[in-house]
Amino acid sequence: MPARKRPTPEGTVTARQTLLDGLARDADILELVSELAPLHPRDNTFPGEVFLHLAADALDWCGASQADPLPLEGLRERFLPECTFRGRQNTKLQYAVLAAAALHGGTEPDLLDEVAWWQTDDLWQYALFTAVAYIRAAASRAGVPVCHVCQDLAQRPGHPAP
């Protein structure tokens, strides 16, 4: 991959901030996908890692833990009502949801091994949907507006570029 197409620290910051700013202003998810698409190098998981770490940060923000778990049942229906997933799309979303939870729990999922069988270049989109769902769920759990969670998460340092 040419150097100009590799993820950069600036791209990581931009991806994180663009998603948080978009959610804070209640932007349409598909609008965010279009806005963030130029950051995604072909045949690369970036910025998926950024969004999975952001989702894990949202779990941390709302205090989800083994002692006080965030229920996943109904997560998609409650927090991504504008999205419709069918067949393998459900499996991809489930993987991203569980990968973010694994990051929150202190493990590092093998994204490349997983997405190799997908035969598509869309992990980053499912990671984005996951971040949106977890941020909305965190806001619901805390009883605060989504923009409040986004503002708090924006103050936290992001994770380095992959």
Task: Report the location of each language-model feature.
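Solvent-exposed interaction surfaces and binding hotspots enriched for charged
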Residues: 1-162
